[in-house]
Amino acid sequence: MKRRKWLNITWAVTIYIFFGMINVSSYNEGRKRKNKMYSFVINGYNEYKNKYSFLRKPKNVVHMENNNFDMDRLSLLKNLEEESKIITEGEGWDKTHPLLEIKDLHAIEIEGEKEILKGINLEIYLGEKHTIMGRNGSGKSTLAKVIAGHPYYKITKGIIKYKGLDLINLPVNVRSLCGIFLAFQYPVELPMVKNNEFLRAALNSHRRHRNEEEISVSEFNLMMIEEIKKVGLSSEFLDRPVNYGFSGGEKKRNEILQMLILKPTFCILDETDSGLDVDSFKLTSNVITNFSNDNNSFLIVTHYKKLLELLKPNFIHIMHQGKIIESGDFSLVDKIENKGYSQFLKE
């Protein structure tokens, strides 16, 4: 009975301390993986340890080595409490080196072992905005997910470095603390988690990592009054469950709100412009433009020229069958508009 209670409440706590739930199922490929998810751990444990006091080490436990339940629990807490000690920048790295460096990257699907990425090479420096374009199924979203650490994909060859660190060996929670942010193409609903609690837990995780004092509820609420206005959402969205009952456009704007709160260094936007009406599109584009500066970088996945006209990316990359087959400036977008992708394909 105690074991069952532990499992049930652990699930509830995990919902709070895990950030950025990802729906692993592909909406276009069917529903067979619909319920599979994974999370970017952001360690919101401290906010809830008073509520869930059972997580603390009980005083009467003596033989911990013989108690798997308590060993698992203490292992979880140890990982959470050491987040401020995580190294998120490689020795000797500075702004003269690429923020993100990818060399000959190959990746497969865990299920079926189908190779999706077939030799990606890419360098992104601080202050740059890069755009990935290509036909459906070319591997654009897969590249975004692999960088973020999606468990549905396995890297079989190649290198990914972020701030000089070997990103391949970094767990997803460390990638988040490093400053990597992914705005999902299909944001997941969390019906049991209030939006304001989710956002504050995420923010405090990053503040703890920077050895900063956690933000109080009152301070957070004051900050959110201004931040939520930027994305065109009313304050009532903060008291609603994360993305639950939101329209497609509201979900996308809520993703951008998370970006504003966390202030990541490397932002991956996976078709953030899809599902937005005209007004939301302009508003979201302006928010992204204003957020962009010399101390952050963007990787933008999109099909639409209109977004790029507003964001003005430094580089355009065209993907086809898991490879980047063409890179250049904005003139590539005009060529795609006029003659499509076939002009870049080798016969």
UniProtKB/Swiss-Prot annotation:
Signal peptide: none annotated. InterPro entries: ABC_transporter-like_ATP-bd, ABC_transporter-like_CS, FeS-cluster_ATPase_SufC, P-loop_NTPase. Proteolytically cleaved. ATP binds at G134, R135, N136, G137, S138, G139, K140, S141. PROSITE patterns: ABC_TRANSPORTER_1, ABC_TRANSPORTER_2. Keywords: 4Fe-4S, Apicoplast, ATP-binding, Hydrolase, Iron, Iron-sulfur, Metal-binding, Nucleotide-binding, Plastid. Induction: Expression is not affected by oxidative stress. GO terms for cellular component: apicoplast. It is found in: Plastid, Apicoplast. Its EC number is 3.6.1.-. Disruption phenotype: Parasites require exogenously provided mevalonate for survival. No significant effects on apicoplast morphology. The keyword ATP-binding applies. Residues 100-346 form the ABC transporter domain. GO terms for molecular function: 4 iron, 4 sulfur cluster binding; ATP binding; ATP hydrolysis activity; metal ion binding. Component of a complex composed of SufB, SufC and SufD in a stoichiometric ratio of 1:2:1. Interacts with SufB. Interacts with SufD; the interaction enhances the ATPase activity of SufC. Belongs to the ABC transporter superfamily. Ycf16 family. PANTHER family: ABC TRANSPORTER I FAMILY MEMBER 6, CHLOROPLASTIC (PTHR43204:SF1). Participates in the sulfur mobilization (SUF) pathway for iron-sulfur (Fe-S) cluster biogenesis. As part of a complex consisting of SufB-SufC(2)-SufD, involved in assembly of [4Fe-4S] clusters. Exhibits ATPase activity. This is Iron-sulfur cluster assembly protein SufC. It comes from Plasmodium falciparum (isolate 3D7). The lineage of its organism: Eukaryota, Sar, Alveolata, Apicomplexa, Aconoidasida. The gene is SufC.
